[in-house]
């Protein structure tokens, strides 16, 4: 998806990195190195960040439209560019401009998508010295969701997120995203999961069957994220958004990633638009999107 959406104009690459949602998310076990084995189904939606990468002679620079984002080596896009030059031995630089639309720290893989997009763009600007597998390997070292973001669409992710299997695409639907103004610590959510039994786990096989059957309502019925109960206990506003979304006509709703964004699946544009308008009175980060395959 990223390579197809990247346009080269001379020494510049223009690309988009899209948001993802979790149709299912299960945490299976904790490894000795502290990482967790997960099993989840992810889906791309049409909300995107716009990224421009210019090929320069030396140095890496980052600029964004959000003043609070780091524009140094702490930014995952910077890490992506740095990793590319170290992996290839190329002596060069990059000027990276990111226009953020995807909320930060929202459970939507905004940063991971930026990372994958920058790796793809710089690789193309230099004549594709790295294979797709090599890009995926670098991406996995920078973030668990990065490998998924290279191709997006509907995929099953296992391991720590690096073992990917393409699935039948999700049927067309309207996806409403609402992020409350809170910051959730993913590490803290995992810590809570480690210390308490998971009572309800996703029906991953059933979700795959529903995808194979192009059954939107079966997909909606099987939305499940084991992190949701933990996050919602800490931040009741998450549960409140989910309840309101369903009352507004969503076929179903669930939290994405470690949160705090909640998304609802709508089969009718007018219901989705009306719900989005009602949330926009209360929250800044409200986005009416569509499934993207």
Regions found by a protein language model. Give the residues of each.
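ATP-binding N-lobe of GHMP and related small-molecule kinases
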Residues: 2-106, 124, 128-133, 160, ...
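Solvent-exposed alpha-helices and their adjacent loops that cap or buttress functional pockets
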Residues: 7, 43-44, 140-141, 147-150, ...
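Short, basic/glycine-rich phosphate-binding loops at helix/coil junctions
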Residues: 57-70, 118, 213-223
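Contiguous, small/hydrophobic- and glycine-enriched helical/loop subdomains that border
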Residues: 93, 115, 119-156
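Glycine/serine-rich anion-binding loops at beta->alpha junctions
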Residues: 97-126, 144, 251-266
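Conserved, helical-rich catalytic subdomain that frames metal- and/or nucleotide-binding sites
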Residues: 151, 156-252, 267-270, 277-280, ...
